[in-house]
Amino acid sequence: SSAASDVYKRQVKDIVEDCGVNRNSFYYHFQDIPSLLEEIIVEMTAKVIENLPEESTFEEKVTAALEEINLNKRMIYHIYGSSNREFYEKQLMKICDYVTRTYIRSRDYSEKVASKDLEFVISYLKCELFGQLIDWLNHDMSYDIVEHSRILCRMFAGSMRMVCQKYKLI
């Protein structure tokens, strides 16, 4: 893909010149450009998680995560089109899991639900959020993912409580 080639058109030589370090310093810290990208992805993931609001609605948590992701939209586009795609997807899933898990565990009904059942709810929401992100990436980030997620969150507000009530989990 052209995104992948854009990432790899940059050579170590270009990177060390732009950063003002020598090649030995680069290779001391990174095996190659993909390992540098992995480190960047890990740092971006940590920053997204770190900047999430503690006490908030699911919509607020999702919005905060997506706004943080949007700050690096161009870089993410190139990484997603590169050989680091699988690694990036795993980090995205980590973000989705964290957003979902912290939200569900903060709900008053979560303590009344069996751990096994709670994990089903978390898994469902996490995978839904991840799927929405992958769809956005596969559409070349061509629509406003923040607004898209706000609409979805409003459409399904209260649905987890209803599921828990329907199956007499609470």
Task: List the model feature ranges, each with a label.
Residues 1-8:
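Short, small-residue-biased leader/transition segments that mark boundaries at the very start
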Residues 40-47, 72, 76, 98-107, ...:
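A short secondary-structure junction motif
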Residues 57-105:
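Helical hydrophobic small-molecule/effector-binding pocket
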Residues 85-110, 116-133, 161:
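Amphipathic alpha-helical packing segments from all-alpha helical-bundle domains
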